[in-house]
Curated annotation (Swiss-Prot):
InterPro entries: Adipogenin. The gene is ADIG. Plays a role in stimulating adipocyte differentiation and development. It is a single-pass membrane protein. The lineage of its organism: Eukaryota, Metazoa, Chordata, Craniata, Vertebrata. It comes from Homo sapiens (Human). This is Adipogenin.
């Protein structure tokens, strides 16, 4: 097999090939950094707005009773 008359990588094509080989890697790194930034920003916002009261869950099923209205009813629901 004979070699091509002009090599694939020379002074003219080297920068072109480096650009097209490095572009996907650079875009992938940029995408990873951007997604990590978005995920960290989302978790910071959710931490400040979420307030969970775990006290009712620590009680037994007979001790916890929901005292509120259901679908606009005025009287409270009885405890079990």
């Amino acid at each position: 097999m004979k070699y091509p008359l002009m090599p694939l990588v020379n002074d003219l094509t080297f920068s072109f090939l480096v650009f097209w080989f490095c572009l996907p890697v650079g875009l992938l790194l940029l995408l990873i950094i951007w997604l990590r930034f978005l995920l960290s920003q989302d978790s910071e916002e959710n931490d400040s707005s979420v307030c969970l009261d775990w006290e009712p869950w620590s009680k037994g099923p007979a001790e916890f009773c929901w005292k509120g209205t259901l679908h606009g009813q005025e009287k409270e629901r009885p405890c079990w």
